[in-house]
Amino acid sequence: MKFSVLTLFPQLILPYFEDSILKRALEKNLFELEVLNLRDFSANKYQKADHTLIGGGAGQILDPEMIENALHSVKNPKHTIFLSAVGKPFKQIDAMRLAQKKHVVLVCGRYEGFDERSIELGADEVFCIGDFILTGGELGALCLIDSIARHIQGVLGNAQSLENESFENNYLETPNFANAVFKSKEINKIPAPLEYSKGNHAKIKQLKLDLSKLRTKFYRLDLFKQHKS
């Protein structure tokens, strides 16, 4: 699989892949990463990347011809995602689906965002990562890549790490407890559920499901209400 990131600030993207799990995955060629500087595709000799708004208003928007040129430079087939606050919220099910793609292109917004024609002509999907505003789409792109890459075979050392995660079946992941002895009196005041240590896997599974439901009801009532029981 390949990820291509189109951004005005490549230096914000590259350091994220210099350590930990995704660094090892790149070294093993489990996925490819390409980072393109949008300014390189500007028709302006000074690499100007933005324009004022028609009809007035504060801020600038990204040059649509620059976006078009950059997207044309990326080989097909590709699935193009624009990162913008106007997009639909990115969810776990999207990460699982997009992990099946061969090439995902992520276009990072900046300033007041995109000319609407860029979205209409270039985007297969538009995503945001929450109901809040960032200075650019780079963090969103990194979030998507991280979330998608985890579902590529071999990226996680233990495939079981993907099982029973938060948002599977719209429940949050069950509370977890370390299998260790601690010196901290405060930690020891809160014992792990006794059932976890008894070895009855059927009962442990049911308890984890019950705790998962309780946690979802407490933290994410919106998800909990999606279940009839």
Curated annotation (Swiss-Prot):
Cellular component terms per the entry's GO annotation: cytosol
GO BP of this protein: tRNA N1-guanine methylation
PANTHER family in alphabetical order: TRNA (GUANINE-N(1)-)-METHYLTRANSFERASE
Family: Belongs to the RNA methyltransferase TrmD family.
EC identifiers of the protein: 2.1.1.228
CDD domains: TrmD-like (cd18080)
Function: Specifically methylates guanosine-37 in various tRNAs.
Gene that this sequence comes from: trmD
Coiled-coil regions listed: none
Protein known as: tRNA (guanine-N(1)-)-methyltransferase
KW tRNA processing (keyword) present: yes
Reactions accelerated catalytically: guanosine(37) in tRNA + S-adenosyl-L-methionine = N(1)-methylguanosine(37) in tRNA + S-adenosyl-L-homocysteine + H(+)
Localization of this protein: Cytoplasm
Residues engaged in binding S-adenosyl-L-methionine: 109, 129-134
The UniProt record lists the keyword RNA-binding: no
Organism taxonomic ancestry: Bacteria, Pseudomonadati, Campylobacterota, Epsilonproteobacteria, Campylobacterales
SUPFAM superfamilies recorded: alpha/beta knot (SSF75217)
Subunit-level organization: Homodimer.
Keywords: Cytoplasm, Methyltransferase, S-adenosyl-L-methionine, Transferase, tRNA processing
A Gene Ontology molecular function term of the record: tRNA (guanine(37)-N1)-methyltransferase activity
Location (main, coarse): cytoplasm
InterPro entries named in the record: Alpha/beta_knot_MTases, tRNA_m1G_MeTrfase_C_sf, tRNA_m1G_MeTrfase_TrmD, tRNA_m1G_MTases_N, tRNA_MeTrfase_TRMD/TRM10
